[in-house]
């Protein structure tokens, strides 16, 4: 009986360690967001909460896109010029240079009638569309309707991350990291399929307001 009890305690201890190990693991969304936060690409709120289960707005998406594809110092130098290119009437002041840059580089477009839809949520199709536009090596023929399917086929996203009508900030973070990898960044996945990300020879983008509306 004593031996059985010792073995049982050992099993319980092992199970406890296993549970602790699993609890310490980060999800792909958490790992991707942590990297993007350190790089100054995706920011959280005043409490440093990345709000991974929440959506993001089209204004926030423009900021993310700009930080991915442009040199931060050059963008800062030309920010007034890009701000002047933003003719939409519904873009907040902090986002005008980002939206102007994205429009000038054919990454985003407005709705017409002077509206960009700054506060509108980003759909999964829109998220995949802009990420595909960030790439210059996509041979597949795609459009807005097939953007999610194309992104999955190219390995930019898992099917479940773009299955909902609107994309979450966490799934957007994963999508961005896979896009960065395809753009030549040194992005590695660990054996547990959690992103282990590093960037060589690149500058962190400037951090500006990107809190949730």
Residue ranges, per PLM feature:
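Short, well-ordered, aromatic-rich surface patches in folded extracellular/luminal domains
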Residues: 172
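Feature responds to low-complexity, polar/acidic, surface-exposed segments characteristic
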Residues: 2-32, 39-62, 66-97, 104-167, ...
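Extracellular, beta-strand-rich glycan-interacting domains
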Residues: 176-177
């Amino acid at each position: 009986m004593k031996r059985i009890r010792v073995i049982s305690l050992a099993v319980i201890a092992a199970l406890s360690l296993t549970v602790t190990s699993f609890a310490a693991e980060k999800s792909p969304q958490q790992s991707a967001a942590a990297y993007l936060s350190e790089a100054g690409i995706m920011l959280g709120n005043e409490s440093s909460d990345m709000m991974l289960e929440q959506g993001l707005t089209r204004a926030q998406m423009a900021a993310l896109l700009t930080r991915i594809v442009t040199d931060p110092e050059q963008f800062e130098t030309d920010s007034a010029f890009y701000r002047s290119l933003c003719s939409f009437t519904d873009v907040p002041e902090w986002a005008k240079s980002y939206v102007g840059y994205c429009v000038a580089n054919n990454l985003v477009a407005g709705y017409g009638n002077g509206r960009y839809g700054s506060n509108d949520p980003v759909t999964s199709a829109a998220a995949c569309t802009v990420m595909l536009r960030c790439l210059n090596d996509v041979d597949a023929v795609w459009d807005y309707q097939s953007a999610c399917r194309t992104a999955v086929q190219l390995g930019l996203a898992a099917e479940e991350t773009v299955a909902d009508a609107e994309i979450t900030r966490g799934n957007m973070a994963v999508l961005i990291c896979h896009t960065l990898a395809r753009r030549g960044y040194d992005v590695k996945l660990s054996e547990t399929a959690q992103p282990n990300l590093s960037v060589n020879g690149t500058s962190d983008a400037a951090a500006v307001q990107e809190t949730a509306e």
